[in-house]
Swiss-Prot record:
Name of the gene: PPP1R18
Chain's role: May target protein phosphatase 1 to F-actin cytoskeleton.
Ranges where the record places region Disordered: 15-231, 266-505, 552-594
Pfam families given in the database record: Phostensin, Phostensin_N
Modified residues (N6-acetyllysine): K457
Stored PANTHER family: PHOSTENSIN, TON-B BOX DOMAIN
Modified sites of kind Phosphoserine: S54, S125, S133, S175, S195, S224, S368, S432, S490, S530
Biased composition (Pro residues): 424-446, 567-578
A GO CC annotation given for this chain: cytoskeleton
Name listed for the protein in its UniProt record: Phostensin
Length: 613
């Protein structure tokens, strides 16, 4: 008998090997299925049945599946009803891909080759897949060699687009051993913001001063480099606006407390404010004056269209460009463009001298950015204690003003100062007319103020207008004899009462529709919700008999039968001047009398709709 040829032996050995691998695979699959939850097992079996595989076989590799004909129920995704999450088609597809990857790795393990470990390592972990995206790749490059990538990015112009988020996230991922490197990495965005010729030591110093305060770093990690640069500039400019170091220590403690968490310690704060005492020096630590002027010019350009908010608001929270304060805009305009404070024109000084005393001190506190150092020292000491609550008040209620920064020299000053005067608590005697102080500084042709105060005259019957947001609330005082309060009668009643000024003429029954004149009951206490939505289905009708029986209200006809018509109308000498508590009862009396006299020509029941608001 001839010996079996070599190739046949190899073939048989390979077949045995394949069978063993298939058996091992089936065993592993069975074990995996037994560990799975029941719903997942059923899902896999259904999928295998659909693909026509035997229960032991693994599902095909995704590459071959895609090469075949398209899945017939691919279109059924559109018709799919909302069901449990694990039955969602897209989630199932993701799970299938994961399972196919697992099965492939198990196949490679089952065949005894050197490939399996490599293959398992090759399979992309979620971290690597995240690194495929450009941002992740960027952060991976920076993790490998921060200095090279920094120089490369400085060469490229696109450095400013990279935000602080990847940097901060990388810093938080680092082990404690790498903390020493953190300051140099933190300084990168600042280095990108500055001109390329600047030395890294300066930006290192910047980063170290910022690193001391974790809260500051947190805020910056949420900002893009541009915004954090603006924020830092806002801080240093706000320090520069205080004219003298000793005065700024005493008088602007409010602001310093607000920004205290940004600075390292009390000594550094003193250093800052002493630096800021001299107007010509630029207080940005470690940044050359030329670069700061470049930055400041971009800031002035962007501050052109900005609106008015408080200076503390600009310091305490990272404000977007649209919300930049009018006062910071003025400060940039006047101090940064030329590098020194703008000279005061005689017109401005006139405008200052015209103003009354409280408003002058208020203006000194509010407009401190643009005051020259000598004037500011003298006048700020006047302002003293009273300016601080005003500043806080104005910070709460400041309103965006449509004035551009160029007009701010005149109109803006007056408007802000008027705000400050209006925000003072109202005078204690409510009936006396308010003093003419608020309107004194307003020039006759000022368009903004005439638009805001249009139709509001400070007369005897009107309280001082109070501001909340953009709205003016005018509170009329009621108990003044010459101005008659608006009684809630119908318009016909009002017209009828006018002609006979000497003799009181009360409305007849036809003139009274519903007491209060609310024909659609839109402002009625009986109507709930907004009248615009509900007035169509709102039909409120009163049946006299039903009212009488159900609620025990006697109708007027029964009252008339008992009493008979009264001979004369009890007329009060001056009903509108009565106390507001008695007003409503009196109106009811006066409006019911003519009805009783007229012998009930209309329906007997009158619905009183004039409920108090």
């Amino acid at each position: 008998m001839a010996t079996i040829p070599d190739w046949k032996l190899q073939l048989l050995a390979r077949r045995r090997q394949e069978e063993a691998s298939v058996r091992g695979r089936e065993k592993a699959e069975r074990e995996r299925l037994s560990q799975m939850p029941a719903w997942k097992r059923g899902l896999l079996e259904r999928r295998r049945a659909k693909l026509g595989l035997s229960p032991g076989e693994p599902s095909p590799v995704p590459g071959t599946a895609e090469a075949g004909p398209p899945d017939p129920d691919e279109s059924s995704v559109l018709l799919e009803a909302i069901g449990p999450v694990h039955q969602n088609r897209f989630i199932r597809q993701e799970r299938q891909q994961q399972q196919q990857q697992q099965q492939r790795s198990e196949e490679l393990l089952a065949e005894r080759k050197p490939v399996p470990l490599e293959a398992r390592e090759r399979r992309p972990s979620p971290g690597e897949m995240r690194d495929q995206s450009p941002k992740g790749r960027e952060s991976r490059e920076e993790r490998l060699s921060p200095r090279e990538t920094r120089e490369r990015r400085l060469g490229i112009g696109g450095a400013q687009e990279s935000s602080l988020r990847p940097l901060e996230a990388r810093d938080w991922r680092q082990s404690p051993g790498e903390v020493g490197d953190r300051s140099s990495r933190l300084s990168e965005p600042w280095k990108w913001r500055l001109s390329p010729g600047e030395t890294p030591e300066r930006s290192l110093r910047l980063a170290e001063s910022r690193e001391q305060s974790p809260r500051r770093k947190e805020v910056e990690s949420r900002l893009s480099p541009g915004e954090s640069a603006y924020q830092k500039l806002g801080l240093t400019e706000a320090h520069k606006w205080r004219p003298d170091s000793r005065e700024s220590q005493e008088q602007s403690l409010v602001q310093l407390e607000a920004t205290e968490w940004r600075l390292r310690s009390g000594e550094e704060r003193q250093g800052y404010s002493e630096k800021c005492g001299r107007k010509e020096e630029w207080p940005v630590p470690g940044v050359a004056p030329e670069e700061t002027t470049e930055l400041s010019e971009t800031l002035t350009r962007e501050a052109q269209g900005s609106s008015s908010t408080g200076m503390e608001a600009a310091e305490q929270r990272p404000v977007e460009d649209g919300e930049r304060g009018m006062k910071p805009a003025e400060g940039w305009k006047w101090t940064l463009n030329s590098g020194k404070a703008r000279e005061w024109t005689p017109r401005d000084i006139e405008a200052q001298t015209q103003k009354p005393e409280p408003s002058e001190s208020a203006e000194k506190r509010l407009e401190s950015p643009s005051v020259e150092a000598g004037e500011g020292e003298a006048e700020k000491e006047e302002a003293g204690a009273q300016g601080r609550p005003l500043r806080a008040l104005q910070n709460c209620c400041s309103v965006p003003s449509p004035l551009p920064p160029e007009d701010a020299g005149t109109g803006g000053l007056r408007q802000q100062e008027e705000e400050a005067v209006e925000l003072q608590p109202p005078p204690p005697a409510p009936l006396s007319p308010p003093p003419p102080a608020p309107t004194a500084p307003q020039p006759p042709g000022d368009p903004l103020m005439s638009r805001l105060f249009y139709g509001v005259k400070a007369g005897p019957g009107v309280g001082a207008p109070r501001r909340s947001g953009h709205t003016f609330t005018v509170n009329p005082r009621r108990s003044v004899p010459p101005t008659t309060p608006a009684t809630p009668t119908s318009p016909a009643t009002a017209d009828a009462a006018v002609p006979g000024a000497g003799k009181k003429r009360y409305p007849t029954a036809e003139e009274i529709l519903v007491l209060g004149g609310y024909l659609r009951l839109s402002r009625s206490c009986l109507a709930k919700g907004s009248p615009e939505r509900h007035h169509k289905q709102l039909k409120i009708s009163f049946s006299e008999t039903a009212l009488e029986t159900t609620y025990q209200y006697p109708s007027e006809s029964s009252v008339l039968e008992e009493l008979g018509p009264e001979p004369e109308v009890p007329s009060a000498p001056n009903p509108p001047a009565a106390q507001p508590d008695d007003e409503e009862d009196e109106e009811e009396l006066l409006l019911l009398q003519p009805e009783l006299q007229g012998g009930l020509r209309t329906k007997a029941l009158i619905v009183d709709e004039s409920c108090r608001r």
